[in-house]
Amino acid sequence: MSHLPILLLLLLVSPGLQAAPTQTMPLKTTQVNCSNLREEIVTLLNQPPLASSNFNNLNREDQRILMKPNLRKPNLEAFQKAVKSLQNAAAIESNLKDLPVCLPTATNAATQHPIRIKDGDWNDFQMKLKFYLKTLEIKQPQ
């Protein structure tokens, strides 16, 4: 009896030899992880001693900048830079480092400046980052 059919069957079902998921086959776990990552950052932003600032208080210009698809990456970089000037923000900084994989690919190059965050101002940082995360949530399917 030949072992060839059994060997071929094993090759077909072996997980190590199956095709890896590609960009055209999105992983559900990646989407879930991005959603969890956004939620974790918001939870950290809402912890005392921070006041629970409402991002509805953002001016229209800041909202427009944070919502622009071609500014998603530059805005994230602005938050990554700003978090370094804040005290006790190591957990948020760590999560922001993981967030780039959750950004959709920009279709156009940024033609304007990203969001400005007041140096060392938790409330400004918190309000703008919450709004930014909300725009990412809206743009990405869950």
From Swiss-Prot:
GO cellular component terms, A-Z: extracellular space
Protein name from the UniProt record: Interleukin-3
GO molecular function, one term: growth factor activity
Function description: Granulocyte/macrophage colony-stimulating factors are cytokines that act in hematopoiesis by controlling the production, differentiation, and function of 2 related white cell populations of the blood, the granulocytes and the monocytes-macrophages.
One of the protein's GO biological processes: interleukin-3-mediated signaling pathway
The encoding gene: IL3
Glycosylation sites: 33
Disulfide bonds: 34-102
Signal peptide, first to last residue: 1-18
Family of this protein: Belongs to the IL-3 family.
Tissue expr: Activated T-cells, mast cells, natural killer cells.
Complexes and interactors: Monomer.
Keyword terms of this UniProt record: Cytokine, Disulfide bond, Glycoprotein, Growth factor, Secreted, Signal
